[in-house]
C-alpha cells in the first residue's frame, strides 16, 4: 500500500498571486502541443507553417477551456452549478471534461480550417498526435489535486487518498497518464510519421482513447453525484466513449477515404 504524497496545490505564490499546479499542468500541456506542432510543421511536405501552428494553439486553448468546463457542467454536475453559479468560473479547483473539451477543439479545428483553406480532417489529422501530452499533464494535475481516484484495491500499488477514506484505491489518474498520455502519444506519433489515408490518424486517436478510457472506468470511482447509469457498472465516461470508439472504427474502416497524405 502506498500513501498519497500530499502536495500543496499551490505551486508558486507571488504576493497576492497564486499559481496552482492544476493550471500549470494545462500550461505544460499547451506548450508541449505547440512544440510538437512546430516540429510536425517543419517536416518535408507539410502544408503547415509555424504561424499556423501558433494560431492553432490559440484556437485549441479556447476550445479546451470553454468546452471542457461547459462539458463538465452539463455532463457531470449541472444541478450543483445551477445552484452555485459563481463556481462555474473556478476552474483552478478542477472540474473539466475531456469529452466537452474535445467538442470545443472540434469546433476550433473547423474554424481554423476555414481560415486557412484546409479540410476539417486535414486539421484533425495534424492535431491528433499533439493531444496526448496534454492528457498526460492533465491527469497529473488530477493526481496532485487528489481527485478522480479509483475504486478500493488490495494491489500493492493501491494508494490512500486524502478524501478517499482509509482504504487503498487504484491510482486511476496514473493509469490514464500511462495509457492516454504515453502509449497513445507513441502510437499516434509513429503511425502519423508515414503517409496515411485522410482521417486515419484521427480515427486511431478516437479508437484508442475511447478504448483506454472505457477500460480505466472499470477501476475508477464513478462521480458521486451520478453513480452508475446502467447495469450497475456503466459510467458517464463510458457512455461518452462509445461514440468515440464507433467514430474511430468508422474512420479506419477498409475502403474509407483513399486520399493518402502525410498527416
Swiss-Prot record:
Single GO BP term: lipoprotein biosynthetic process
Primary site of residence: membrane
A Pfam family recorded for this sequence: LGT
Keyword list, A-Z: Cell inner membrane, Cell membrane, Membrane, Transferase, Transmembrane, Transmembrane helix
Keyword NADP among record annotations: no
Family matches, as InterPro entries: Lgt
Protein residues bound to a 1,2-diacyl-sn-glycero-3-phospho-(1'-sn-glycerol): 139
Name under which the protein is recorded: Phosphatidylglycerol--prolipoprotein diacylglyceryl transferase
Source organism of this protein record: Nitratidesulfovibrio vulgaris (strain ATCC 29579 / DSM 644 / CCUG 34227 / NCIMB 8303 / VKM B-1760 / Hildenborough) (Desulfovibrio vulgaris)
Lineage, broadest ranks: Bacteria, Pseudomonadati, Thermodesulfobacteriota, Desulfovibrionia, Desulfovibrionales
Gene: lgt
Amino acid at each position: 500500500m502506498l500513501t498519497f504524497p500530499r502536495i500543496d496545490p499551490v505551486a508558486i505564490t507571488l504576493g497576492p498571486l497564486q499559481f496552482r499546479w492544476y493550471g500549470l499542468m494545462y500550461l505544460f500541456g499547451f506548450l508541449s502541443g505547440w512544440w510538437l506542432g512546430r516540429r510536425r510543421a517543419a517536416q518535408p511536405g507539410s502544408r503547415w507553417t509555424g504561424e499556423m501552428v501558433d494560431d492553432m494553439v490559440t484556437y485549441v486553448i479556447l476550445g479546451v477551456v470553454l468546452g471542457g468546463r461547459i462539458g463538465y457542467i452539463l455532463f457531470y454536475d449541472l444541478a450543483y452549478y445551477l445552484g452555485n453559479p459563481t463556481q462555474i468560473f473556478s476552474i483552478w479547483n478542477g472540474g473539466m471534461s475531456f469529452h466537452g473539451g474535445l467538442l470545443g477543439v472540434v469546433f476550433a479545428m473547423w474554424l481554423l480550417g476555414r481560415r486557412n483553406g484546409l479540410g476539417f480532417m486535414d486539421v484533425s489529422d495534424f492535431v491528433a498526435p499533439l493531444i496526448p501530452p496534454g492528457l498526460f499533464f492533465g491527469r497529473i494535475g488530477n493526481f496532485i489535486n487528489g481527485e478522480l481516484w479509483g475504486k478500493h484495491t488490495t494491489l500493492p500499488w493501491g494508494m490512500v487518498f486524502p478524501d478517499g477514506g482509509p482504504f487503498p484505491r487504484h491510482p486511476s489518474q496514473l493509469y490514464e497518464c500511462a495509457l492516454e498520455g504515453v502509449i497513445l502519444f507513441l502510437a499516434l506519433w509513429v503511425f502519423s510519421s508515414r503517409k496515411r489515408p485522410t482521417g486515419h490518424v484521427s480515427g486511431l486517436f478516437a479508437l484508442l482513447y475511447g478504448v483506454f478510457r472505457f477500460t480505466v472506468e472499470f477501476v475508477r470511482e464513478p462521480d458521486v453525484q451520478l453513480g452508475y447509469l446502467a447495469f450497475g457498472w456503466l459510467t458517464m465516461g463510458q457512455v461518452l466513449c462509445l461514440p468515440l470508439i464507433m467514430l474511430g472504427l468508422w474512420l479506419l474502416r477498409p475502403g474509407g477515404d483513399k486520399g493518402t497524405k502525410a498527416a
